[in-house]
């Protein structure tokens, strides 16, 4: 998305025609509870809302996020990451923009949003949705601070409307605001039935210890997907911010881990043991109780580790980004200073092979990854939304409230697997039949999936896939590494091929043989000449298996299409008799060929698709005239009719998006 050029007449404030102050910017199809406010929402500029508007406050807490009527807590939690890093905030909200008291102020601001591999500038006017003269969506703790509602408007413009921000994943917003990666860690044992987990297992406790280590380096969010009975005050499908973690000792010497939770609603909602005046504080010294309670700001509360693991469902952690723009590992703190990205696509009938349960898995897009040194590597597959988020047609005329069903929120279940290979010329079926060195646990309905691994130097084959075959989609493959890397797409050999030479659908194993025609030695010409047996005689065989095999034989001469030295070429295929293994080439070539690719043609490449039974064969490539010199490659592609790879690929659960809005529930 390109920034809108804010060229306005003197003394006239900018009005964004691409995202106007109207219902078309508020709603997509009136499918959310926002529809009930349709007649009451007005648009005002900050100087019409308060006397002295400012972008950022002197006190950082006064700029903290606070949720309004819009169910976009997932986005607001990600915005909190910007407050932990000034260089990230400057990246998203470029400094030096004229404010309301500046003579250069013209009524517009520019933000940057990371979209599918690029930072895109988004310019908006500063007219904001209001109810009764106050901001009705996001706001800061001090309502005369406007960086947050302006950024929210820019994000809504990217998505097409404010209503499109209703429900989402914190991880997606973190990526859009930082360009980094984000991980989602489940706090529940997925092998247990929902709602029946009374005490967390050891793995979840280790997660909390990891969070304690990460608290100063990253944004950490936590979500409630389905609150337990007795904890309904947390809401359902709601996201929170973990502001702090404190490890302390009880009066009896027992270790206690407390987590400080910030609710974007802006009010305290927790009635657990560690609420103000709760029984949990009896375990610590009164001075420590006073110290920790004094740290609480509006909308914050303390939760003990056991309560946290019982009441919350998952945490989301954003990878730290250095001032140089490099990601830092969540697991080792090492800087992933080498980055490579490449786009790709799953095309129905061509490269949408599905998961490894399908025999057409090898048809999926494939990428070469080369490591020059031992490295920690993160490889991610980011899906492009199925719709263009901007400039879409909105269904507002005569619309009535309906169940929330916003397009673009659903993504395909995708996975990623990586194989170590010895070199770039490989037998693809053989490689893919072996266990991968790294792979996702299952195909997940995430916008972006990724895996982290420690890899040794060498070549690797990375294959992203959807769970179902023939499902179209576009993606961006991103690789982050501590060591030097190279990334390239595996290209099919289609140079010079005509539409008729394309391989039929299926799995093919390819072998290439190279040779040359030399005058007086191996340039025997066509079968019209007695010197024909002097031509190169290339052996190949059709192995035993399930009957005859389809074979595509292609002869390519090594010269440019525009080269005046293009020779007429062709080839014949001879079958070796079962008892003729020791038969010399000369006597074999005096027999009639089994099949031919003639007449000889002035072409860079000629080919023939045939059905051959099990046995041994000889291919004889030739030019039409004897003593015509040149070099060539013969490619033999054999169709493999193999059974499905029994890899027992699993399908992840559908994502629960967080959106809960407290004001309307209250």
From Swiss-Prot:
Region (Domain III 1): 322-488
A single GO BP: regulation of actin cytoskeleton organization
Region (Domain III 2): 507-648
Gene Ontology molecular function: calcium-dependent cysteine-type endopeptidase activity
Gene Ontology cellular-component terms listed: cytosol; mitochondrion
EC number(s) per entry: 3.4.22.-
Pfam families referenced in this protein's UniProt entry, alphabetically: Calpain_III, Peptidase_C2
Source organism superkingdom: Eukaryota
Residue ranges occupied by any Calpain catalytic domain in the UniProt entry: 13-321
Residues annotated as catalytic: 73, 238, 263
Entry annotated with the keyword Ribosomal protein: no
Enzyme class, first EC level, given as a word: hydrolase
InterPro entries, A to Z: C2_III, Calpain_cysteine_protease, Calpain_domain_III, Calpain_III, Calpain_III_sf, Papain-like_cys_pep_sf, Pept_cys_AS, Peptidase_C2_calpain_cat
Keyword Protease assigned: yes
Keywords linked to the UniProt accession: Hydrolase, Protease, Repeat, Thiol protease
Family membership noted in the UniProt record: Belongs to the peptidase C2 family.
Function: Calcium-regulated non-lysosomal thiol-protease which catalyzes limited proteolysis of substrates involved in cytoskeletal remodeling and signal transduction. May play a role in insulin-stimulated glucose uptake.
Official protein name in the record: Calpain-10
Organism expressing this protein natively: Mus musculus
The gene coding this protein: Capn10
């Amino acid at each position: 998305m390109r920034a809108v050029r804010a060229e306005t007449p003197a003394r006239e404030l900018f009005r964004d025609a691409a995202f106007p102050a109207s219902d078309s910017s508020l709603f997509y199809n009136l499918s959310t509870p926002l529809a009930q406010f349709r007649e009451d929402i007005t648009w005002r500029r900050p100087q019409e809302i308060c006397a002295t508007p400012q972008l950022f406050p002197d006190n950082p807490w006064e700029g903290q996020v606070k949720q309004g009527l819009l169910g976009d807590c997932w986005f607001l939690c990600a915005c909190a990451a910007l407050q932990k890093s000034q260089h990230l905030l400057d990246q998203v909200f470029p400094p030096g923009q004229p404010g309301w008291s500046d003579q250069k102020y013209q009524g517009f601001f520019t933000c940057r949003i990371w979209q599918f591999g690029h930072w895109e500038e988004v310019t908006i006017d500063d007219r904001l949705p209001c109810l009764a003269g106050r901001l009705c969506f996001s706001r800061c703790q001090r309502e005369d601070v406007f960086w947050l509602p302006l950024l929210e408007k820019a994000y809504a413009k990217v998505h097409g409307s404010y209503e499109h921000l209703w429900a989402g994943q914190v991880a997606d917003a973190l990526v859009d605001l930082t360009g980094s990666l984000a991980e989602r860690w489940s706090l529940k044992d997925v092998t247990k039935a929902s709602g029946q987990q009374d005490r967390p297992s050891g793995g979840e406790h280790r997660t909390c210890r990891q969070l304690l280590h990460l608290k100063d380096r990253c944004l950490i969010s936590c979500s409630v997907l389905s609150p337990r009975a007795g904890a309904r005050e947390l809401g359902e499908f709601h996201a929170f911010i973990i502001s702090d973690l404190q490890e302390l000792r009880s009066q009896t010497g027992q270790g206690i881990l407390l987590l400080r939770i910030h609710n974007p609603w802006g009010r305290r909602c927790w009635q657990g043991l560690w609420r103000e005046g709760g029984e949990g504080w009896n375990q610590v010294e009164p001075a420590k109780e006073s110290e920790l309670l004094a740290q609480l700001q509006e909308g914050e509360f303390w939760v003990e580790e056991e309560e946290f693991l019982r009441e919350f469902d998952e945490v989301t952690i954003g990878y730290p980004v250095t001032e140089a723009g490099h990601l830092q590992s969540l697991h080792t703190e090492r800087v992933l200073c080498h980055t490579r990205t490449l786009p790709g696509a799953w095309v129905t009938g061509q490269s949408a092979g599905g998961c490894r349960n399908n025999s057409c898995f090898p048809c999926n897009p494939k990428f070469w990854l080369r490591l020059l040194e031992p490295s920690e590597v993160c490889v991610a597959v980011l899906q492009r939304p199925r719709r263009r988020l901007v400039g879409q047609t909105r269904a507002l005329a005569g619309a009535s409230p309906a169940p929330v069903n916003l397009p673009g929120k659903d993504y395909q279940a995708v996975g990623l697997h990586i194989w170590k290979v010895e070199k770039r010329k490989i037998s693809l079926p053989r490689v893919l039949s072996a266990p991968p060195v790294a792979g996702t646990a299952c195909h997940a309905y995430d916008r972006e999936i990724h895996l982290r691994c420690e890899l040794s130097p060498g070549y690797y084959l990375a294959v992203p896939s959807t769970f179902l075959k023939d499902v179209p989609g576009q993606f961006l493959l991103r690789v982050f590494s501590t060591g030097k890397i190279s990334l390239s797409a595996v290209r099919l050999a289609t140079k010079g091929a005509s539409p008729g030479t394309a391989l039929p659908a299926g799995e093919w194993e390819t072998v290439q043989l190279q040779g040359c025609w030399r005058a007086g030695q191996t340039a025997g010409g066509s079968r019209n000449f007695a010197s024909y047996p002097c031509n190169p005689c290339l052996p190949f065989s059709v192995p035993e298996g399930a009957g005859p095999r389809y074979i595509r034989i292609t002869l390519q001469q090594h010269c440019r299409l525009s080269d005046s030295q293009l020779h007429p070429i062709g080839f014949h295929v001879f079958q070796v008799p079962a008892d003729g293994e020791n038969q010399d080439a000369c006597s074999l070539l005096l027999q009639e060929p089994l099949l031919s690719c003639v007449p000889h043609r002035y072409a860079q490449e000629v080919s023939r698709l045939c059905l051959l039974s099990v046995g041994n064969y000889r291919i004889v490539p030739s030019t039409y005239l004897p003593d015509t010199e040149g070099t060539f490659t013969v490619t033999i592609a054999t169709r493999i009719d193999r059974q499905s790879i029994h890899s027992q690929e699993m399908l992840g659960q559908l994502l629960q998006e967080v959106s809960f809005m407290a004001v309307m529930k209250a």
